[in-house]
Each structure stands twice: as structure tokens, then as C-alpha cells.
Swiss-Prot record:
GO terms under cellular component: extracellular region
Disulfide bonds: none
Protein name in UniProt: Probable extracellular metalloproteinase 4
Subcellular location as annotated: Secreted
Gene: MEP4
Membrane-spanning residues: none
Enzyme class: hydrolase
Family the entry assigns: Belongs to the peptidase M36 family.
Annotated organism of origin: Trichophyton verrucosum (strain HKI 0517)
């Protein structure tokens, strides 16, 4: 689950931040079942660009515009040949989410198979450079002995309905599946089913027969998918012993407008103003068109925003403000109460912030082919049908927020709650950093491992980086014109009514204010605590690049690019972090993500910022000699030669 504050990192008496008793959540009770104990193992390897073996033979050129032309099939062939050369005995399938990013890198993803069955946590991603050769690659393929017996021959596995019952009982899921009512209906794919006749889930549960790489071997499992609101789970149930769960992945992480404008983080930083036609010209349409209609409400191609006071999964018929003239101006002040009295302003603010962020990310490369959130992809690649569902004042919780990220083609879902640590209570929709944090979970999950694979941040350190990326983008976007590297920032300060925010330390380049180092992750089990370390490193990176390239005009929304490269350090940092997500392997660790960011800069600027990047990471212990180990990390302040 990708919530803003589900963390033991706070060391606060405010345990309401982690599914409070006041919440009417339908998700997994974290006091009863700790689903984090079922995380996927962290087994990926990443071969960075300067470690890729020398390549001979023909090459092709990717298009920096991302156009799919004759060469588009060639980069897939090059990637496939590289996999065959690297792992000649492996069997696999091509995942249908390859694309050429706007930085000119071709991204191709493969899934390992055995007896025609997916080994679900095995991935091989190949990044093809502008010169047509392999730029870098990641690998988590299983290299052990494949079971000799084909389970499909003797049908040596349980009925999928039994696996569904196993998932429900083991995880105490709020799903009812009476044996006499439940039917497993086959759908497209081998041993792939949808369950009919259940209740309690937001959509029909599903199951697929897969292998899972675990403890040095392969276990045949049913991958059971259940969306129960606060948790959208993939539960890997043993295909023979249905009371045994091997692993769990959670997809959830949580005109004219009168709003707090872009760059104003919360009501303490500025006043509401009227914004005219705020959308950026990234597409040929505005925010209220999806190719099927023009909606005089908070609905369009990128998002649909509404109130949800009951916390119910239904959203299409929920209340949202309407304006035939597209004038969304409604009263609000932080002193107003109850929250329902300003619901129109809340929904409008949420719709505005999310759409602006969508447009900024689009310019920086998170577009249709990369798996962004849009109903209509305008024939530009990727899978459509997946705008972001935005719930304002969601009644399923308080003092939090979350975002669920299923694979490309299925809508993301953001739940924004009210916060009761102040009088009157506060609405998280008016703190842009919370909205941006949650939406960024959708971004990092879609980019890492490819748009069709939403389980690539399910390991502990990977999930921690997911939280860190979300804090980083929220912080980078709120920078002010007078800020310097001596400026510190908090997260969630306004909504939580806590002057120091909701993280252990402020984000700061001062090691006195924020002493976090890489090795601090040892012993941590909270993704939010680990994420604070990662975001602290990225904050150093941000200021190193700003000091070199300037921060640009922070009052302007649209990033300025020259030959595809942002001209200011702030957006350049955001760009190479985004590109790094697409380069890194599935289930990355800090070291691999650092290398992917270095590779992103190498591709984008020919490595002109190499030393600035290394200095940022080395300052906080992720230098040349740093090494990942789940329980005992090796820190390093060493810089490479020349830096």
C-alpha cells in the first residue's frame, strides 16, 4: 500500500497516521496481519552503461521524438538477441509494453517462463541507446534447476477457488466467497481465471497459475488478485498447500479555477487565486475532453475527481461540481467547518493539482508509451482507459492518503482524507505536496519494470525508494525563487499540524539538520523511514544541479527544454530521476537506482553532471564503495576518479 504516512518512522503518539480506529477502512487490518512480512525478495541485478560488454554488429538509431517507425521493431530484436546471448538457456516471453522514451532510449521487458508458465518475479529489462546498442540492462531471472515435471500434464495443482479461499483466510481479507456461490470463469491466458459470485471486493477477484522464485527454487503458486480498497493485493498462494502464502504485493501506495496555484504547497504559503486555462499544451485537448465528450465538471482525459464521504468504491455517480461555463470558483478558508461545507473547493483543488502535475510529467517524459494515466492515448502508444480516480474527503480513513497503481490500462486510484490533528480539521487536498506524493507512486510504479508490471517496488528497499521519490518530487516542485541550498523543507507539515512535518528529519543539505546516511537503512522495516534516506540523497542531487544550472523561473509551470534537456537544474534533476526509473531493474536497491540515475544523465547530457551526481550520493554514504545487503549495508563517501 502506497500511503503517505503508514510509517513507524514517525515515533509519534499519532498512530492515527497508520489506519486509525476512526477509519472505516475495508483493507487488511495491519494489527492482525502484517502483509509487509510477505514482501518479495530483492534479487535484481543492474549492469550500468559503462559495465556493458563491448558489442559488435549492426545497430539502429532510436528516435528522440519517440516515433515508432521502421526501426521500432529493430530495438526489440536487438534486446531479444542480447537476452539470448546473455542467458542462452532461458525460456521467456516478451512483455508487450516496450517503447522508445523521449530521451531516445528503447525500453524492452521480458518475463521468464517454465513449461509455458510465467515465473512471476523474474524480469529482464534491456535499455537500447541512441546508437542502437545495449545501453544498460537489469536481470532477476532464475538460474537454478527448472522442475522437470510439467504441472500442466497431470494437472498437479489445486482448484483456483481453493486458492482464493486460502488468500482470504490467511490474510483475513474482507471478502466473502461461499463455495456454493463462487465460480472460476476462464479468461484469456493459460490457467487464468476471474471469480464470480464473491462479495466484499471492489472488483471480481482473479487468479493465475504462476511460478514464484523463492529461497533458491521455484514454487508453483496461484497469483490471487483482490482489490479491497485500502489494499489491492497480489497474493501468491501455494498451488498445492492453499493455506500457505509465499508472497504478497500491494498495488496501493494514497477553464477557470479558484485554487492555490502551482508552487503554493499549502494555505500558509499563499492565497487562492483564479487561474484561466491552466493546462499545458502537451496534448491537443484541455482537461475536460477525453475524445468522447466535453465534461462541464471535474472530469476529463487525465482524471475524474469527486467527493467520497462514505469511502465506497463507487465513484462515477458520486457528487462533483458542475459548471456549464467551466468556471470552478467556490469559497474556502482553513477556518471553515465541516469539510463538507467546502467540498466543491476541495474537489476543484485536487483536480487542478493533479492535472498540472500530469502535464509537467508529460513534458518530462511520462507520456502514453511510458504508461501514464489517460483514458484516451490519442494513438500515441501505451494502453488507454486509465485516468486517475481522485477521491476528495474520502471516508475510508483519516490523517492519511494513498494511491493504488494497477498495470497500464487500469485506472489509478487516489484517496485523499481529512486530518483531525487541528481544530478545525484540515483537508489534505489543499496540501499540494500530499497530492503530488501520492500521484508520484503511480509514476514510479509504472516506470520501474515497465508499464505492465506494477510489482517492481514491492521489496523493502524498492518500496522505500518509492516513498523517497514521492517526497522528492513534492519538495522539488514547491521550491521558491529565494531558496538556496540552505533552505530546509518538511513533508505534511500543514495537514498534520506539526511544525517539523511527518518525517524524522527535515529535507536539508545540512548534515546537522538531517544526518541521514545510507547505512541508516540497516534494521529499518518501514518503507517511509527508508524513503526519507533516499529522498535526502535526492535533495542533495537537486541542489547540486541547481547550483550548476540555476533553478529557472519557479513561477512558470512549464519546464523549458532544449534538445530534450531541461535548461534549469530543478527540472533536470526531476528528468534524470524519471529516466532512471525507466532504466533500473525491477525491484531495485539504492545502489542500482543511483547507477540508473548516472546512466540517465550519461544518455541525456553525455554525463556532463556525473560529478554533481556522485557528490550528492557520496555525501550521504552511497559513494563508489557502497554495497547493498539487506541487513548490513556498506557505506562509502568515495568519489570516482576525476571528481
Amino acid at each position: 500500500m502506497h500511503g503517505l504516512l503508514l510509517a513507524g518512522l514517525l515515533a509519534l503518539p499519532l498512530n492515527v497516521f497508520a489506519h486509525p480506529t476512526e477509519s472505516h477502512s475495508s483493507g487488511v487490518s495491519r494489527r492482525a496481519i502484517d502483509i509487509t512480512s510477505y514482501r518479495l525478495p530483492q534479487i535484481s541485478k543492474y549492469t550500468k552503461s559503462d559495465a556493458v560488454p563491448k558489442q559488435d554488429g549492426e545497430s539502429f538509431t532510436t528516435s528522440s521524438t519517440g516515433d515508432d517507425n521502421v526501426s521500432s521493431g529493430d530495438y526489440v530484436t536487438t534486446a531479444t538477441n542480447w537476452l539470448k546471448k546473455t542467458l542462452p538457456k532461458a525460456t521467456y516471453r516478451l512483455v508487450n509494453d516496450h517503447y522508445i522514451g523521449d530521451s531516445g532510449i528503447g525500453h524492452v521487458h521480458f518475463r521468464q517462463t517454465a513449461h509455458g508458465i510465467d515465473i512471476d518475479n523474474t524480469d529482464f529489462n534491456v535499455n537500447i541507446g541512441r546508437d542502437g546498442k545495449v545501453f544498460s540492462f537489469g536481470n532477476s531471472f532464475y538460474d537454478g534447476e527448472i522442475p522437470k515435471a510439467n504441472p500442466m500434464v497431470k494437472r498437479d495443482f489445486s482448484d483456483p477457488v481453493n486458492a482464493l479461499h486460502g488468500a482470504i483466510q490467511t490474510l483475513n481479507l474482507p471478502v466473502t466467497a461461499k463455495p456454493e456461490n463462487v465460480k472460476a470463469k476462464p479468461v484469456e491466458g493459460k490457467e487464468n481465471f476471474k471469480f464470480e459470485g464473491t462479495s466484499g471486493a471492489l472488483s471480481d477477484p482473479k487468479a493465475q497459475l504462476v511460478y514464484l522464485q523463492k529461497d533458491g527454487g521455484l514454487v508453483l503458486s496461484w497469483k490471487v488478485e483482490t482489490d479491497v480498497g485500502d489494499n489491492w493485493l497480489l497474493t501468491y498462494v501455494d498451488a498445492n498447500k492453499n493455506d500457505q502464502v509465499h508472497s504478497v504485493v500491494d498495488y496501493v501506495s494514497a477553464a477557470e479555477y479558484q485554487v492555490y496555484p502551482w508552487g503554493i504547497n499549502d494555505p500558509t504559503e499563499g492565497n487562492r487565486t483564479t487561474i484561466h486555462l491552466p493546462w499545458l499544451k502537451t496534448l491537443s485537448t484541455d482537461w475536460h475532453i477525453d475524445g468522447k465528450g466535453w465534461y462541464p465538471t471535474t472530469r476529463g482525459n487525465n482524471a475524474i475527481a469527486q467527493e467520497n464521504p462514505t469511502g465506497h468504491p463507487e465513484y462515477e455517480n458520486n457528487y462533483r461540481p458542475k459548471s456549464p461555463l467551466f468556471i470552478f470558483k467556490y469559497p474556502y478558508s482553513p477556518a471553515m467547518t465541516p469539510p463538507s461545507s467546502y467540498r466543491d473547493a476541495s474537489i476543484t483543488q485536487l483536480f487542478y493539482t493533479t492535472n498540472v502535475y500530469h502535464d509537467v510529467l508529460y513534458i518530462l517524459g511520462f507520456n502514453e508509451k511510458a504508461g501514464n494515466f489517460q483514458i484516451n492515448n490519442w494513438n500515441k502508444g501505451g494502453v488507454g482507459g486509465d485516468f486517475a480516480i481522485l477521491n476528495s474527503q474520502d471516508g475510508s480513513g483519516v490523517n492519511n492518503a494513498n494511491f493504488a497503481t494497477p498495470p497500464d490500462g487500469q485506472p489509478g486510484r487516489m484517496r485523499m482524507y481529512t486530518w483531525n490533528a487541528s481544530t478545525p480539521e484540515r483537508d489534505g487536498c489543499f496540501e499540494a505536496g500530499i497530492v503530488i506524493h501520492e500521484y508520484t507512486h503511480g509514476v514510479s510504479n509504472r516506470l520501474t519494470g515497465g508499464p505492465e508490471n506494477s510489482r517492481c517496488l514491492a521489496a523493502l528497499e524498492s518500496g522505500g525508494m518509492g516513498e523517497g521519490w514521492s517526497d522528492f518530487f513534492a519538495t522539488a516542485i514547491r521550491l521558491k525563487a529565494g531558496d538556496t541550498r540552505a533552505t530546509d523543507y518538511t513533508m505534511g507539515e500543514w495537514a498534520s499540524n506539526r511544525p517539523n512535518g511527518i518525517r524524522k528529519y527535515r529535507y536539508s543539505t545540512s548534515l546537522t539538520t538531517n544526518p541521514h546516511m545510507y547505512v541508516d537503512a540497516d534494521g529499518l522495516t518501514s518503507v517511509h523511514a527508508i524513503g526519507t534516506i533516499w529522498a535526502s540523497m535526492l535533495y542533495e542531487l537537486l541542489w547540486n544541479l541547481i547550483d550548476k544550472h540555476g533553478k529557472g523561473d519557479v513561477t512558470k509551470i512549464r519546464p523549458v527544454l532544449k534538445n530534450g534537456v531541461p535548461t534549469d537544474g530543478r527540472h533536470l534533476a526531476m528528468k534524470i530521476v524519471l529516466d532512471g526509473m525507466a532504466l533500473q531493474p525491477c525491484l531495485p536497491n539504492f545502489v542500482q537506482a543511483r547507477d540508473a540515475i548516472l546512466d540517465a544523465d550519461k544518455n541525456l547530457t553525455q554525463g556532463s553532471n556525473k560529478c554533481e551526481i556522485w557528490k550528492a550520493f557520496a555525501k550521504r554514504g552511497l559513494g563508489v564503495g557502497a554495497a547493498f545487503n539487506q541487513t548490513k549495508r556498506t557505506g562509502s563517501n568515495e568519489l570516482p576518479a576525476g571528481c
